[in-house]
Amino acid sequence: MLSADFLHLEKDVEMVNLNADIFHLDVMDGVLVPNISYGFPVVEAIAKKATKTLDVHLMIVHPEKYVERFAQVGAGMISFHLEASDRDGTDPAGILAQIRSDGVKSGLAINPDIPVERVYPYLKDADFILVMSVFAGFGGQKFIEDTYGRVRAVKAEIARQGLSCRIEVDGGVSPSNASALAQAGAEILVAGSAVFKAENPADVISKMKSDDIA
């Protein structure tokens, strides 16, 4: 929703309700990432109109302080960055458990410069891994091509551990790469600019959903 028209947000919420499966909400604090987006009031307002799951992506420091509140205002999925735990000196497994204890699907996100192997110890604690295909913090960036290999590697490790953890990809996603991402193992694709800047957003979503992904 970062690329939505915030002056006419209800219209875009209804479009997502009718065509997509998940609302992806980017929460940025200007500390972990350079940009600032929105917080509880916007998420809560969207939750009141949304008929699909709210996937809240926390690009913030100390996400453990805010997980419960985001769950209360309507999040059904919450992810946070491994880089936040590195910065804060917190245990990712503990935060993932906290998210689950609030009745929400738990996710761990990594930027393109973080080795994917670093998420392997936490696959059993996470419901999904968010593989960023751009650097977190701004919408409209160009898709990073080595994301395909990173997704394949995480998918193989999930299978090796015998887990059901899903893979989400966010950043520069469009109909031109959706099929290849699905083939690599992605099950949830986040498309912002490709959808909201399109002349026919519903058509773009339909093209990507034809690849059997969320």
Q: What is each PLM-predicted segment?
A:
Residues 105-109, 113:
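Internal catalytic-core helix/loop-beta-alpha segment
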Residues 1-79, 83-93, 98-101, 106, ...:
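Conserved N-terminal beta1-alpha1 strand-loop-helix module at the mouth
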Residues 161-169, 174-178, 182-214:
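Alpha/beta catalytic cores of nucleotide-metabolism and tRNA/nucleoside-modifying enzymes
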Residues 26, 35, 133-136, 167-168, ...:
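Short glycine- and Lys/Arg-enriched binding-loop motifs that mark or flank ligand-binding interfaces
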Residues 79, 109, 130-133, 168, ...:
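Conserved beta-strand segments that form the floor/walls of ligand-binding pockets within enzyme
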Residues 113-115, 174:
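Short acidic loop-to-helix transition motifs that present clustered carboxylates
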Residues 134, 140-141, 162-164:
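Strongly charged, low-complexity linkers/loops
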Residues 139-144, 170:
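Short, glycine/charged-rich beta-strand-loop motifs at protein surfaces that mediate ligand recognition
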